[in-house]
Each structure stands twice: as C-alpha cells, then as structure tokens.
C-alpha cells in the first residue's frame, strides 16, 4: 500500500537509490497503490553519473510492498521493504537490470519487460 509521501527503494540500475511517491495514478480520488500500479515519484537520492539525478520527477511501477499481497489460492506474499522500478512515458524500464524478486501480478498488469529482466518471479 503506497500512498503520497511514501519512500521506496529503487530496484533497477537507473542510478536512483531512493524515491518518494508524489502521486498515485489511476483516478482522481485514488489514495493507494499496490504491486503493478504506476505512481509518480521524485528522486531523493541518486548515484553520480546515473541516468537520472536528484530532483527529477519520473513514473515508476511498484514491484514490492511491505503490505500483504493476497492471491486467489489463499496464499500471501509480503516483502521487507517497498520497491519500485523507474519507467519512461512509454512504460519501458529506464534501467537495464532489475534487482531482487518481483511478483506474478506484474505479468497480469502487462509489465512483461520488468518480469523478463527480473532474476526471480514469485
């Protein structure tokens, strides 16, 4: 459950390390984002010579949340930290690598490029 002002880790090699959610996309009154949802983020911490710099405003896909993800078979998945992958306006990831596991829910929401780059899909 990601909302405005939530801090997230960045799970790719775009150069950003930490981002903050400034808007959840998908409706004017939408408050929360879950895995697979697109949010607007501000980059709070970045490495030198990365593809992005501190202060940039980008879109991102949420790939891991500390809040439970419930599945139809009754199983539950949760992660230690919230994480996102930065994307461009066409929905393609900015980085060329994804760090850490991602969930199957990304496949259902048509983020196939992120799923294919991820080392593990839960």
From Swiss-Prot:
GO CC term (a single one): cytosolic large ribosomal subunit
The entry's keywords: Ribonucleoprotein, Ribosomal protein, RNA-binding, rRNA-binding
Signal sequence range: none
Lineage: superkingdom: Bacteria
Transmembrane segments: none
GO biological process: translation
Record carries keyword Oxidoreductase: no
PANTHER family: 50S/60S RIBOSOMAL PROTEIN L14/L23, LARGE RIBOSOMAL SUBUNIT PROTEIN UL14M
Family label: Belongs to the universal ribosomal protein uL14 family.
Name of the protein in question: Large ribosomal subunit protein uL14
